[in-house]
Amino acid sequence: MRKTDHVFKNQTHHVPASADRIDSRHTWVICAYGQSPYLEDCVRSLLRQTVRSRILIATSTPNEKIRKTAAHFHLPVYVNEGEHGITQDWNYAVSCAKTRYVTIAHQDDIYESIYLERALKGLRGARHPLIFFSDYYEIRNGEKVSSNRNLRIKRVMLLPFLSRLLQNSIFVRRRVLSLGSPIDCPSVTYVIPNLPEGPLFDSTYRVAQDWEAWERISRIRGTFVFDPHLLMGHRIHEESTTTELIADQTRTKEELSIFRRFWPERAAGWIEGKYRKGQDSNRM
């Protein structure tokens, strides 16, 4: 038994047999690429949701592994035949869904069975929701890590979002984002009709495209719906794209460009230098 199996079986809630609700307003889009050994675990975590919705796979690297996994779970596969790249693949994934709510599920990650149930509850409670996001844990070497320096810093940054009133404040969310990005991209569900038309992510970014998107969305009137429960597990491993891009300093360059949207040049450089130390938490 792989360690990843151990994490999945012990950290994911079991769905009651009576959980047969289907929500036609939501779609899970799994971004799949290469030969990930974790893809099936991701799919199973979505199938175990207490509220069911549509699941599909989007990929720019079709292969036998992805095809067999899709066939085994009876999932449709959408192939991106246009421009490739991590950001382009995310935009393509969003375009494959035709529902009000869309969650981009990263193939290496897993979701607690109550994720969608809590997401829909939170979104229904907001007058004009923009995105939903939750707290999360990391998966390192097959083990669940609920707290480390990086996670603790992010949770402190997210404290203002515990207030439903402050979730609606453009000022507050921009002050939070001016210090970095505490929002974990795989934990986000997008309310597509309430977001600007056009690509959700800027294709000139390769690793900070999520933070760049939050910065643009933060200017819009509406709600950043936050759930403090640990509703998903984000896998950290050497082969991940994020880890590779940190190694070649891509993230440093992109994050500095975003800090400049909030701060004068010298202040942006100083803050980025402090923020860069947090990148070490994404290395194995």
Please provide the spans of the model-predicted regions.
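A conserved acidic beta->alpha catalytic loop
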Residues: 58-67, 106
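Acidic donor-diphosphate engagement hotspot in glycosyltransferases and nucleotidyltransferases
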Residues: 90, 111-119, 142-143, 209, ...
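Conserved donor NDP-sugar-binding/catalytic core segment of glycosyltransferases
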Residues: 114-154
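Short aromatic/hydrophobic "clamp" motif used to bind/position activated sugar donors
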Residues: 102
